[in-house]
Amino acid sequence: MSTARFIKCVTVGDGAVGKTCMLISYTSNTFPTDYVPTVFDNFSANVVVDGNTVNLGLWDTAGQEDYNRLRPLSYRGADVFLLAFSLISKASYENIHKKWIPELRHYAPNVPIVLVGTKLDLREDKQFFLDHPGLAPISTAQGEELKRMIGAAAYIECSSKTQQNVKSVFDSAIKVVLCPPKPKKKNTRKQRSCWIL
């Protein structure tokens, strides 16, 4: 019997977008009701995806600016990033390309990214938007466009509260590592060299 392959999966994104809730929902099938800012927490789960057993190491990171110098320490050895934003926070959506992509490309330039839109249950919650005037939800089309813009391997929307698509997020991360997408071929037209003798 072969040992399960270890995959290090690191969650990244602004504070309070639901990274920790997503991990807890996935590993324990529960939804925490209190917000507790994260420093670093690690979870581990043995998972079977498409007949492959993997030991999925889940690393949670803090999105707050106070941890900007500490957070990148968790990036070493990462196999995949779950880059999360809240579907009800335009600021967290915009920070994906303003803050998080530059940080990830600096510290881990070749690690694949799965883009995750969290709090899917609130996007259609009319009462939530009545209680929070001025907020506008992020659409699936906007998420797909951001995926293309940053070159993410996948984009998934989920709700940790209802558990909708939570398993799909982690299955997708595992599949990206086990079967990485083929890099797009650049248009390589033969260029002729000009030599001056």
Swiss-Prot record:
Lipid-binding residues (covalent, S-geranylgeranyl cysteine): C194
SUPFAM superfamilies per UniProt: P-loop containing nucleoside triphosphate hydrolases
Coarse class of the protein's main subcellular location: cytoplasm
Binding annotation for GTP: 13-20, 60-64, 118-121
Record-given protein name: Rac-like GTP-binding protein 7
PANTHER family, A to Z: RHO FAMILY GTPASE (PTHR24072)
GO molecular function: GTP binding; GTPase activity; protein kinase binding
Family according to the record: Belongs to the small GTPase superfamily. Rho family.
Annotated keywords: Cytoplasm, GTP-binding, Lipoprotein, Membrane, Methylation, Nucleotide-binding, Prenylation
Cysteine methyl ester PTM positions: C194
Coiled coil (UniProt feature): none
BP GO terms, sorted: actin filament organization; cortical cytoskeleton organization; establishment or maintenance of cell polarity; regulation of actin cytoskeleton organization; regulation of cell shape; signal transduction; small GTPase-mediated signal transduction
Organism whose genome encodes this protein: Oryza sativa subsp. japonica
Membrane-topology descriptor: Peripheral membrane protein
GO cellular component, one term: cell projection
Propeptide boundaries: 195-197
InterPro entries: P-loop_NTPase (IPR027417), Small_GTP-bd (IPR005225), Small_GTPase (IPR001806), Small_GTPase_Rho (IPR003578)
Superkingdom per UniProt: Eukaryota
Subcellular location(s) of the protein: Cytoplasm; Membrane
Keyword GTP-binding annotated: yes
Function: Inactive GDP-bound Rho GTPases reside in the cytosol, are found in a complex with Rho GDP-dissociation inhibitors (Rho GDIs), and are released from the GDI protein in order to translocate to membranes upon activation.
Tagged with keyword Nucleotide-binding: yes
Pfam families in the cross-refs: Ras (PF00071)
Name of the gene this protein is made from: RAC7
Motif (Effector region): 35-43
